[in-house]
């Protein structure tokens, strides 16, 4: 019998699309509830529980596992909970095949040997594959053969790339295809543009999906008390000095901001009696964090923006883990509900 994929019972339309990935946004619940079946072990590659809404709930799920392994460059908080931590080699410690514009291929050779027991992620996968006596065309013959496997369609060999660090142009170049739909159709059950989605219609009775595009304002369907939480919380945008959680490990980059910045529009600052640099508290139905107000003209009135990844004030602590898009299953990182108020005292760095 075919085993039900993780997320399939909650977001079935995801699996009817041309997608080969499980939907893991609710994996913490699946682990803790043992539904649709018990999940006893997990192997993560760079797993960071703080990237999920209500990260403490995910942390609880990791602790409930019988066996948990994390492969990472850093001894992160998620790694500290693991039964086994496998150190990953950095990009300076591994050979990697790259392709560039114009059909060019390159070999990025390691600058140094892996430090300590660090290994390439793929080599770790190959080791697990062999230990479990599994077979995979791309991986089972080792890392060198894996890179050759990647290159094979191009007609370029690994030996050529080693001899030509400037790169080698692929001999088999697949030109851009135009109007592929005329021969292959679209990725829909009918192969046509569907004004009424057959996939969504399939789950109309079981999940309430509508085959026709239907606008539903999230502010009205959430059931949220808008008087208590009148502002919209936005997170996940970019900052030039930060890249997700990883750059918070670099003290001089993290130190550019004394604490978590809470960006608000001048109109909201005036409305709530907040000045630039004030200590504020942002609260939602599931949590609250403190930060420093940054009155920001380029933001929208009614929107509060908090950057993610800062363990000292994590934006995802504010987002309900059940606030998910009903079709795709992705969390509403851009549109949850909050309030803001001035806090007494000073923010500790």
Language-model regions: role of each:
Residues 1-80, 90-96, 172-272:
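Extended redox/cofactor-interaction regions of prokaryotic respiratory oxidoreductases
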Residues 18-21, 118-122, 126:
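Electropositive phosphate-/nucleotide-binding environments in soluble metabolic enzymes
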Residues 83:
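Catalytic, metal-anchored helix/loop core of enzyme active sites in primary metabolism
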Residues 86-87, 316:
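Catalytic alpha/beta core of large soluble enzyme barrels
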Residues 92-114, 125, 129:
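Glycine/threonine-rich phosphate-binding loop and adjacent beta-strand/alpha-helix elements that clamp
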Residues 97-98, 105, 112, 161, ...:
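Short clusters of hydrophobic/aromatic residues that line enzyme substrate/ligand-binding pockets
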Residues 121-167, 244, 249-263, 267-349:
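Long, contiguous, secondary-structure-rich segments that constitute the structural scaffold
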């Amino acid at each position: 019998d075919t085993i039900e994929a993780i997320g399939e019972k909650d977001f079935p339309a995801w699996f009817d699309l041309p997608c080969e990935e499980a939907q893991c946004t609710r994996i913490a619940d699946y682990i803790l509830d043992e539904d649709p079946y018990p999940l006893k072990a997990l192997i993560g590659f760079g797993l960071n529980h703080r990237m999920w809404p209500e990260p403490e709930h995910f942390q609880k799920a990791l602790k409930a596992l019988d066996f948990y392994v994390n492969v990472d460059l850093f001894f992160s908080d998620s790694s500290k909970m693991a039964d086994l931590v496998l150190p990953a080699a950095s990009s300076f410690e591994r050979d990697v095949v790259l392709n560039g514009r114009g059909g060019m291929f390159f070999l990025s050779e390691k600058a140094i040997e892996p430090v300590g027991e660090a290994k390439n992620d793929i080599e770790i996968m190959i080791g697990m594959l062999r230990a479990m006596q599994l077979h995979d065309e791309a991986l089972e013959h080792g890392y060198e053969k894996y890179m050759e496997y990647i290159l094979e369609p191009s007609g370029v060999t690994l030996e050529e790339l080693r001899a030509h660090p400037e790169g080698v142009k692929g001999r088999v170049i697949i030109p851009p295809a135009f109007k592929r739909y005329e021969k292959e159709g679209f990725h829909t059950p009918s192969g046509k543009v569907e004004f009424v989605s057959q996939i969504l219609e399939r789950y109309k009775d079981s999940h309430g999906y509508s085959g026709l595009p239907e606008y539903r304002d999230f502010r009205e369907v959430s059931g949220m008390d808008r008087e208590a939480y009148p502002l919209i919380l936005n997170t996940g945008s970019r900052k030039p000095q930060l890249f997700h959680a990883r750059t918070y490990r670099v003290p001089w980059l993290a130190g550019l901001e004394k604490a978590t910045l809470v960006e608000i529009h001048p109109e909201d600052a005036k409305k709530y009696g907040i000045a630039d640099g004030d200590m504020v508290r942002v609260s939602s139905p599931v949590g609250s964090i403190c930060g420093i107000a940054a009155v920001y003209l380029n933001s929208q009135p009614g929107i509060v923006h908090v950057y993610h990844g800062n363990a000292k004030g994590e934006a995802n602590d504010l987002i309900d883990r059940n606030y998910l898009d009903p079709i795709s299953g992705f969390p509403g990182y851009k549109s949850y509900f909050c309030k803001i108020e001035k806090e007494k005292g000073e923010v500790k760095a």
